[in-house]
């Protein structure tokens, strides 16, 4: 999973 998706979900 890309960091963009991870932080976007947070």
Swiss-Prot record:
Brain. The keyword Secreted applies. The keyword Secreted applies. Keywords: Amidation, Neuropeptide, Secreted. GO terms for cellular component: extracellular region. Transmembrane segments: none annotated. It is found in: Secreted. The modification Arginine amide is found at residue 10. One of its GO terms (biological process) is neuropeptide signaling pathway. Its main location: secreted. Myoactive peptide. Increases the amplitude and frequency of spontaneous contractions and tonus of hindgut muscle. This is Tachykinin-related peptide 7. It comes from Rhyparobia maderae (Madeira cockroach). The lineage of its organism: Eukaryota, Metazoa, Ecdysozoa, Arthropoda, Hexapoda.
């Amino acid at each position: 999973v890309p960091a963009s998706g991870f932080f976007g979900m947070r």
